[in-house]
Amino acid sequence: MSSVRLPSVDRLLRSAAAAPLHQRYGREALLATLRDLLDELREPARRGALAEIELSEAVLAGRAGERLAAQHASRVRRVFNLTGTVLHTNLGRALLPDEAIEAITLAARYPLNLEFDLASGKRGDRDDLTAGLIRELTGAEAVTVVNNNAAAVLLALNSLGARKEGIISRGELIEIGGAFRIPDIMARAGVRLHEVGTTNRTHARDYEAAIGPRSGLLMRVHTSNYSVQGFTASVPTAQLAAIAHGHGLPLLEDLGSGTLVDLTRWGLPKEPTVQEALADGADIVTFSGDKLLGGPQAGLILGNRELIGRIKKNPLKRALRVDKLTLAALEAVLGLYRDPDRLAERLTTLRLLSRPAAEIRAQAERLAPALGEALGEGWEVAVVDALGMIGSGAQPVARLASAALCLRPRQPRRLRGRALRNLEEALRGLPLPVIGRLDDDALWLDLRQLDDEPAFLAQLPRLRSELS
């Protein structure tokens, strides 16, 4: 095949085929893409490895359009979380209710009284936007909000215990995802770790014996992401608070996930509430906004007015403060807690966590035939009982009764791994990626969080073509 001549960049820019790209992406982006494309084709064209049709204006504009679309596609993608883990850290944790989404939109679109007191006309405090509501719901004397619970713990420790000892049970030296370890956080906060007791048993006398002139605070951490069972002992908050206060020390309790309601009301496992921790005498309580609370990422610090005042004066507070969008969403979510009787229908996270297994199974029965048709005869599609998880370190042992579509290749066992990987990749490559979980030589799609059936079904023809 003889060599063919490449069209000039200028000719392609002025072509009718490139006009829509020029309008959509702008001249500079289109120019750079065309130059890169022609540079790649120059050598193959010289060798005669390309046909003239491959260098036509229409074909080249089409290839440039594909590249530009990929370059300009958002890295933030909506996905279907069918893993069975509701508060999946890697998939964004809590889903916000409509009220919070509307509040975020309003705060993003218009100026607002972020740090402006409308009554006095003077500078205000951004914490005031949510503090009154949080005090009303929890009974806390004072409140401040930072950007996540790790920041809340760091700030509270640094404000109350810097250059002093923090006394904590050895069984509560937790690690959560992202290398967050209590000993490391205490060190960063300038607090000297003084661990007491053993991994499985800590007694009141252990704390009493550890308190001395260098003591700055007692700390209690809710071990929400693991469970120690069997021969165990721990000191409840009320008793630990009495010990701390008897020596003039504050008690800091980190609840981790944190909740404002008794989850057993909706058939979920018991989690300690913020109100219980405060009523039992904890001086400062910290917890997350985007886990069981069902709100945006935030770290809430509640408790004693004088101690919260010290925390708010810490220079780190400004570095860790939240923005207007977070506060707008948080206020909207907290407002839903004023009506606990309707909370499960309005708070997205609680609605998903408490969704009945029978309802999920009925959904799976509806979807199974269509998915079986899309996958073809090489796959078995079965509706099975499943056990999901809350996620984000909340109740790691507890399971949520659910139902799933179990996709198993009809192939010899030695070939199933490749088939499953191909299917998993095809599902992730859909316009709305579908994320499931591999288990027992099958791909499981737990439907607890499948809210949008039409969008899921609309992708099945695309899935079939990808697999064929």
Curated annotation (Swiss-Prot):
Its main location: cytoplasm. One of its GO terms (cellular component) is cytoplasm. Its EC number is 2.9.1.1. The keyword Transferase applies. Keywords: Cytoplasm, Protein biosynthesis, Pyridoxal phosphate, Selenium, Transferase. Converts seryl-tRNA(Sec) to selenocysteinyl-tRNA(Sec) required for selenoprotein biosynthesis. This is L-seryl-tRNA(Sec) selenium transferase. It comes from Pseudomonas aeruginosa (strain LESB58). The lineage of its organism: Bacteria, Pseudomonadati, Pseudomonadota, Gammaproteobacteria, Pseudomonadales.
